[in-house]
C-alpha cells in the first residue's frame, strides 16, 4: 500500500513557477509586482487602480456546513475548484484568507488547503508570509500605546479610563492575556487600568484592512475607530489622538494583495484574515475586486459554516463593497454530517447511514439559508477515504429532494481532475442568470431587530435575550448615527445555536447577547453571544508540540 504523503510533503515537492510568470498569466507586468523571494509578491496599488473600468468576472462563494474541530476542507475545495475551473478552460483566480498563527499552533496546524489542492508556498503562508499580520498587530498596538501615552501626559481629551474600549492584540492563542491590569509598577509607568488582548484576527484593524477600498479609505476608517469615551460620554476617535496617519503608514504595504500560486500553477490571491466566529470571516475587498477585474471566475471562501461566514460575506462584505455573488458552493463531508447526526468523534470512520441522514438536516438548513440571499447553490461532498457508497448516495438523494445537486469531489487526492464535475456545474449556475442577490435585512432597521432577524431566519432561534445595558448601548449608538450599520455576530462555529454541543438543526433555542462592541471604522456592530472568546486558548495538546525543524532544516508538523 502506497504511503499517503502529508500536505507539507506534497507542497514541498511541487514544481513552482517564478511568481513573475504567474503574474504574467494575469497580464500583470513584472514592474507592478513587488516580489517577496521567488514565489510570492504584492500587486502594486497603481496597477490595481488602473483596472477600475474593466468588466467584472463571476464571483463564486465557497461555504460549508457546521464543521468538526478539524474543519471540512473548505479552503481545500476553494483551491480545488479554482484549479478545476482553469482545467476546463476558464480563467479563474482563487481568493482566500491568510493563516493566523493562533490556530496554526493550536488546533489546525495550517490553513492553506490540503492534499493536492493547496496554495503554495505552504510554510510561508502559514507562518510569517509577507508580514501583513505583523503590520496589523503593530498598527493596532500603536493605537493602544498612544491612548495610554495621551493619558500619561495630561489627558487633554478627558478620556474616562474606565470606559476605554480599545484592547491590545497579538496573533497567538493565549488565554492568560484575556484580562490584564496594565501600567503597574509606579508613577513612571502611567495610570494602572484594566485591559486585555484580543487575537489579531479579531482586531478592528484587520477588519478595516479587509473592507477598505484603497489607502485613502483605509486612513479614513482608521480615524473613525472609537477607542473609548470621555467623562461626558462622548466618543473619542483614533483621529482625536492623531493616530490614523501613523497607523496607515504601518499598513501601507499590507493593503496590497499577495499573489501566490496553487500546486497546479494557477494564480491565487491570499490577503487578510479575520476569523468568522469573532469577526467577519472574509478575505479583503481589494483582493476580491482585483481578482474580478483579472479573471472570468473568482472563487472565494467565507470562514466556518454558512451560518457565520456566508451570512457575513453577504450582509457585511457584499453590502459594503457592492459585490453580487453569482453562485455558492456548500462543502459537506460525510463525517461532519454523521457528527451532526449524533455520532461520536471516535466512531466517525464507521458506516452509519441512519445518523448521516439525521445529520443532513444541518446541510438542509444551510442550503435553505443561502437561498434566502437569492444565490443559486450546489453541494460539494468533500471525499474522505472512509466514506462508503451508501453514505454518499444518501447525501445525494437528500440534496436532490431539496431541489439541488450534490457532487462528489476528490480534489484532495486527485487535484483538479477530481473536481471537474463541480467546476462545470458552477459555470452552469453562474451563467444561468438565476442569481438575484439581496442582503438579509435593510440598513434602516434598528440594530436589535437586525440581530433578531439573523437569529430567527439563519439560526432558527426562538428568542434573543439582551439585558438592559446591552439594549441601552444599542439605542445610544443609534442616537449617535450608527443604526444603519450591519451586525457581525460572534457565535460558536459548531452549532446553529450558541451552545457548541447542540448539533443538527435546532429550533426555538435562545440566543443570549452577552456584549456588543461598535467597530465604527470597520462599519459594523459586533454582537457577542454565548461563551465565545475574542482571545482563544490553546488546547491540551496544541499543534505547536508537533511542529519542528528536521535535520535538513525543513519544517515538519504543519498540515
UniProtKB/Swiss-Prot annotation:
For this UniProt record, give its keywords in alphabetical order, as a comma-separated list. Answer: ATP-binding, Ligase, Nucleotide-binding, One-carbon metabolism
InterPro entries membership: Formate_THF_ligase, Formate_THF_ligase_CS, P-loop_NTPase
Residues the entry annotates as binding ATP: 68-75
User: Pathway it belongs to?
Assistant: One-carbon metabolism; tetrahydrofolate interconversion
Keyword Ligase present in the record's keywords: the answer is yes
At the top level of its lineage, which domain of life is listed? Bacteria
MF terms in GO: ATP binding; formate-tetrahydrofolate ligase activity
Q: Does the keyword Nucleotide-binding apply?
A: yes
| Similarity comment | Belongs to the formate--tetrahydrofolate ligase family.
- What is the protein name for this chain? Formate--tetrahydrofolate ligase
Q: Which organism is it from?
A: Rhizobium rhizogenes (strain K84 / ATCC BAA-868) (Agrobacterium radiobacter)
Lineage, please? Bacteria, Pseudomonadati, Pseudomonadota, Alphaproteobacteria, Hyphomicrobiales
